Amino acid sequence: MSKKSNKNLAFSLLGLMMSMVLLSFASVPIYNLFCKVTGYGGTTIKETVSVYSKVKGTKAIIIEFDANVDPNLPWHFIPRQKRVQIVPGQNTLVFYEAENLSNKDIIGTSIYNVTPNKAGKYFVKIHCFCFEEQLLKAREKVLMPVTFYIDNDFERDPEMENIKVITLSYSFFKIREL
């Protein structure tokens, strides 16, 4: 091989490596955008104007809460409640707890989904920590609120007839240390 072809190969490999690093940092925001646009993976609806339903449903639904943390993020993250029982149209406030176990300030972001996936279109979030990146100072512990309701149309959808339990799951990922 000539020096010119070795140089071209080196630049090509360097460019490929840089592209992979950039893509790894952009993957969570790109995934969130993809899910919001397509409704993929049980993505919920974000209420842009807080319209609180005055009409409440009659079918009791259990909402279970799940929390996961990427191994690269030294946080402890748990739901404060394991489950709640609600009816469609009932506004509900729950909390997750996050603690930064490191000696550094860290910014994290979360992705979420609802299972079963087909119930995601009826899960409406009014307020959620997942709408923004979260900064936790070194050794800081915080409560993170989520306010939501299940849309009343849930009861009228024949596909939801056998749904008794819905799981809201969050996964936190590290953005950067400060």
From Swiss-Prot:
NCBIfam families according to UniProt: PRK05089.1
Segments in the Cytoplasmic topological domain: 1-10
Periplasmic-side segments: 36-178
InterPro entries the record matches: CtaG/Cox11_dom_sf, Cyt_c_oxidase_assmbl_CtaG
Keyword field: Cell inner membrane, Cell membrane, Copper, Membrane, Signal-anchor, Transmembrane, Transmembrane helix
GO biological process, one term: respiratory chain complex IV assembly
Keyword Transmembrane annotated: yes
TM spans (from-to): 11-35
GO MF annotation: an example: copper ion binding
Similarity annotation: Belongs to the COX11/CtaG family.
GO CC annotations, alphabetized: plasma membrane
Protein name: Cytochrome c oxidase assembly protein CtaG
Subcellular location as annotated: Cell inner membrane
Protein purpose: Exerts its effect at some terminal stage of cytochrome c oxidase synthesis, probably by being involved in the insertion of the copper B into subunit I.
Principal subcellular localisation of the protein: membrane
Organism: Rickettsia prowazekii (strain Madrid E)
